[in-house]
Amino acid sequence: MSTVDIDSLVEQICSLDLCKAAELVEKMEQKLGFPKGGLLTAVPAAGGNQVEGGAAAEEKTDFSVVFESYAADKKISVIKAVRECTSLGLKEAKEFVEKEGAKELIEGKKYKKEEAEEIKKKLEDAGAKVSIK
């Protein structure tokens, strides 16, 4: 077929009413051997880059470091590590460590992945339980 034939074919297809278009699709699926249910079951939705749960596959770049708990016998080393990783003084670092429950290391502060991993390792080596979110 030449391009002129393709152009006229496109015009003819576009002029079909909904019933005729559905019939055309069904016959094309049969002729080409597509599975029952059509192409929509085999082809991902437009926008494609999606992961489970519908979240975008875009890689996250900003992370929070969440301090969860610490080993009681490592309290002093954990306080020192918290002071190293933040600008907190001794009293504030001690209060932070002793406060119950999971909390961000620095409220609202986001870190690059490498920096967050480094902080996590430093705190875990000191005896803290830390996660990155």
Swiss-Prot record:
Could you name the domain of life of the organism this protein comes from? Bacteria
Q: Which UniProt keywords apply?
A: Ribonucleoprotein, Ribosomal protein
Q: Which SUPFAM superfamilies match?
A: ClpS-like, Ribosomal protein L7/12, oligomerisation (N-terminal) domain
Example of a GO MF term = structural constituent of ribosome
Any one cellular-component term (Gene Ontology): ribonucleoprotein complex
What is a biological process (GO) this protein takes part in? translation
Briefly, what is this protein's role?
A: Forms part of the ribosomal stalk which helps the ribosome interact with GTP-bound translation factors. Is thus essential for accurate translation.
Xref: HAMAP family: Ribosomal_bL12 (MF_00368)
Q: Which family does the similarity line name?
A: Belongs to the bacterial ribosomal protein bL12 family.
Quaternary structure, per UniProt, is: Homodimer. Part of the ribosomal stalk of the 50S ribosomal subunit. Forms a multimeric L10(L12)X complex, where L10 forms an elongated spine to which 2 to 4 L12 dimers bind in a sequential fashion. Binds GTP-bound translation factors.
Official protein name in the record: Large ribosomal subunit protein bL12
